[in-house]
């Protein structure tokens, strides 16, 4: 049986990596991941103002894959440049709004809140991820924490990025607010 390979392009942030890897796994693809870093000037410009060239990437890489799955602003131009060079030899998928013409990609998978529409756009309710039904089924008891029948409140907190970085004081303030708003006698709090 032919095994399709995918090249995954992201900026290396966990939220993006989990989406591209989740899609690759769901499609049954073997994959390799490249964290994209653009050269200094091009790093500052939005994709719609950036020329389409593989020369904008700090580190060159080969593409021996039939599928490219990209996610994030910095992966847009390398994905389009590879499609331009390889044409129909590859199938390009971009996750999230690429902020450029949708025609540059074979498929775009975008959450509803990005509010983009097109013949090649598949809309999701939220971010895609790498969890499978089997993993969820195998771990059903993992969060069996509500024996007291309290209201469950879950907080899914992302990691640091260019807009926000956590320090000990911020984490302490956040947890204090959560504990104040959702008292332990009435709520069971899950923080991920």
Locate the predicted segments by residue:
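Extreme N-terminal starter segment of soluble prokaryotic enzymes
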Residues: 2-7
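Active-site and donor-binding regions of nucleotide-sugar-utilizing enzymes
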Residues: 8-129
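Alpha-helix C-terminal capping segments
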Residues: 24-27, 61, 143-146, 181-182
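Glycine-rich phosphate-binding "P-loop"
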Residues: 36-47, 155-169
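Glycine-rich beta-strand-to-loop/alpha-helix junction loops that act as flexible
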Residues: 71, 157-160, 192
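A nucleotide-sugar donor-handling region in carbohydrate enzymes
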Residues: 103-167
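Donor-nucleotide binding loops and adjacent catalytic segments primarily
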Residues: 149-150, 163-192
């Amino acid at each position: 049986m032919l095994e399709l390979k995918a090249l995954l392009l992201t900026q290396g942030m966990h939220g993006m990596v989990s989406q591209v890897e989740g899609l690759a796994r769901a499609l049954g693809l073997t994959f390799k991941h490249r964290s994209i870093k653009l050269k200094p000037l091009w790093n500052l410009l939005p994709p719609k103002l950036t020329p389409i060239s593989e020369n904008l990437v700090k580190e060159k890489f080969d593409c021996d894959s039939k599928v490219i799955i990209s996610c994030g602003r910095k992966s847009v131009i390398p994905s389009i440049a590879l499609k331009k060079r390889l044409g129909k030899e590859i199938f390009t998928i971009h996750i999230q709004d690429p902020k450029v013409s949708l025609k540059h990609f074979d498929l775009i998978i975008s959450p509803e809140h990005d509010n983009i529409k097109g013949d090649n756009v598949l809309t999701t309710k939220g971010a895609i991820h790498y969890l499978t039904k089997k993993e969820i089924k195998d771990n059903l008891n993992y969060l069996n924490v509500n024996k007291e029948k309290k209201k469950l409140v879950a907080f899914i907190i992302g990691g640091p990025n260019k807009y926000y970085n956590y320090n000990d004081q911020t984490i302490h303030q956040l947890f204090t607010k959560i504990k104040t708003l959702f008292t332990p006698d009435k709520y069971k709090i899950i923080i991920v």
